[in-house]
């Protein structure tokens, strides 16, 4: 009796472990692949994909589309991997006439699993492995029926008695399966040589690769929160990541956006060292599809829809037609009144399984000419003469937005932060006088005040007051204490509060040096 149910016990343990892995540790991978591929029930697309990438790639895209719900994607991949175990076990028994005591039949399933848990590799290999297993099982079925020697061995195996202590063999099989899984994990995190942009290569150690996977997971979770406009979650993720002390441009960029939407950009930006300088606030264009994928987010929030559209189109070129890129491009075109272009981006979504509802919503927005939550800050700006977006200098774009939309709060705060991070006090103060007068009550945000202290050291207190600005006594006292500590030179011991100031950034952190432009 125990022998009869042994394979079902092993399969159940395997299924539970796979589901836990897919829905916890590797849930972000399932989400990532679904977001970067789009299967369509559309003849031209099917023929083109089949011709360019082959049948297995097309089948994999078909499977990946169900990961729109990550739990459903996890169920499908788990079913295929457990199915591969049963097929391999049956083929083994038919061809060898032996029992699988060391769970060799689980090896294809382990290989399939580790082919589906990397964001760098499309899980096409897992589908190929399953196809090979299925083909091997069919061959074993034919041989065990028409080759007498194989048929007799298989019949003898089925008629053999159960044997003693079947629990021991079950435990041995489960232990062997665990060893295969551990070996697969070791191989997936083994040191790897990677080519760099400068033509050189670098070998990443096992520890570095494990740390890299952690960063991948956090970045993808952060991007998901941003897409969902869940600013509380994005703030929590980026704060936790910053607290780890790891330098990452994308997470600094996301953190700045989260801080703004929390109303904390000019209060808490300096809580952690801004080692990327002005690049904390944006992605400069580097002809890289990853940069293109993320660079447009800040422009969308700022209301520079045309610039966001340029970034999104570059991402479309780099990644292909995905639901995110198509829907974003459609939204941007709708807001700018480009109806025919919007229709072209909406059309592919109508042929999908899960994004048809999104296509209908975009059609509704196209009819109304408005998109919920999206504002075109440059709608009233003359298009002649034409102006090129500055893909290397966010400051120029911020100025352009403010000239067209002086009440744009995000552009105003980002401009203040940008010029301060660039060590450009002169541009910071000129921009402040033009677009951000002193409030009648209270004071400016802490980061702005800290910049004004340095401006005051250049133009004098009388001129600063004549321009309508004032600095709180608390900030002036903090600055005096900072200068006293700074004057100690190598013996300076800055407090945590002093390290979280713009003055400390200029003296110790800024990648643009200590020199201030005025």
Stretch-by-stretch model annotation:
Residues 17-22, 106-117, 155, 159, ...:
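Aromatic-anchored segments of alpha-helical transmembrane domains
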Residues 1-18, 166-169:
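Start-transfer (signal-anchor) and selected internal transmembrane alpha helices
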Residues 163-184, 207:
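Internal/C-terminal transmembrane anchor helices
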Residues 115-125:
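Membrane-interface helix caps and helix-loop-helix hairpins in membrane proteins
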Residues 204-388, 403-424:
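Soluble catalytic regions of membrane-associated enzymes that act on cell-envelope
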Residues 78-96, 110-113, 136-144:
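Transmembrane-helix motifs of polytopic, lipid-linked glycan transferases
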């Amino acid at each position: 009796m125990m022998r009869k149910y042994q394979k079902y016990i092993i399969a159940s343990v395997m299924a539970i472990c796979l589901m836990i892995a897919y829905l916890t540790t590797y849930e972000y991978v399932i989400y990532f692949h679904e977001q970067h591929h789009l299967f369509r029930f559309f003849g031209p697309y099917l023929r083109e994909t089949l011709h360019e990438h082959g049948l297995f790639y097309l089948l994999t895209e078909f499977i990946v589309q169900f990961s729109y719900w990550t739990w459903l994607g996890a169920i499908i991949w788990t079913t295929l991997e457990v199915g591969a175990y049963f097929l391999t076990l049956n083929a083994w028994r038919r061809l060898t006439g032996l029992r699988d005591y060391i769970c060799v039949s689980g090896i294809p399933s382990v290989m399939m699993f580790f082919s589906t848990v990397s964001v760098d590799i499309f899980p096409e290999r897992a589908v190929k492995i399953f196809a090979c297993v299925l083909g091997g099982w069919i061959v074993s079925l034919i041989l065990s029926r028409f080759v007498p020697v194989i048929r007799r061995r298989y019949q003898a195996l089925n008629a053999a008695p159960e044997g003693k202590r079947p629990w021991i063999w079950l435990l041995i099989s489960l232990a062997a399966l665990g060893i295969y899984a551990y070996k697969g994990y070791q191989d997936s995190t083994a040191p790897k040589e990677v080519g760099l942009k400068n033509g050189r290569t670098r070998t990443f150690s096992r520890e570095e690769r494990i740390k890299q996977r952690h960063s991948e997971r956090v970045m993808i979770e952060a991007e998901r929160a941003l897409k969902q406009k869940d600013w509380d979650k994005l703030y929590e993720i980026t704060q936790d990541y910053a607290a780890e002390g790891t330098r990452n441009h994308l997470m600094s960029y996301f953190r700045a956006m989260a801080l703004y939407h929390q109303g904390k950009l000019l209060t808490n930006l300096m809580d952690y060292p801004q080692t990327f300088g002005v690049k904390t606030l944006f992605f400069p264009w580097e002809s890289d599809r990853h940069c293109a994928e993320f660079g447009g987010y800040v422009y969308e929030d700022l209301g520079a829809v045309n610039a966001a559209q340029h970034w999104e189109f570059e991402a479309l070129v780099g990644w292909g037609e995905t639901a995110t890129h198509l829907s974003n491009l459609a939204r941007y075109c709708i807001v700018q009144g480009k109806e025919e272009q919007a229709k072209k981006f909406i059309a592919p979504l109508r042929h999908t399984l899960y994004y048809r509802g999104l296509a209908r919503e975009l059609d509704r927005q196209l009819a109304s000419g408005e998109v919920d939550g999206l504002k075109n800050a440059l709608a009233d700006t003359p298009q002649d003469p034409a102006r090129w977006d500055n893909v290397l200098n966010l400051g120029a774009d911020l100025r352009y937005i403010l000239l067209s939309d002086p009440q744009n709060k995000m552009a105003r705060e980002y401009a203040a932060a940008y010029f301060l991070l660039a060590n450009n006090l002169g541009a910071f103060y000129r921009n402040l006088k033009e677009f951000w007068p002193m409030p009648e009550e209270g004071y400016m945000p802490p980061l702005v005040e800290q910049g004004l202290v340095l401006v005051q050291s250049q133009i004098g207190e009388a001129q600063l007051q004549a321009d309508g600005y004032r600095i709180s006594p608390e900030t002036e006292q903090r600055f005096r204490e900072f200068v006293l500590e700074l004057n100690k030179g190598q013996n300076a011991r800055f407090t945590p509060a002093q390290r979280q100031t713009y003055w400390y950034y200029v003296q110790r952190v800024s990648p643009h040096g200590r020199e201030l432009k005025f």
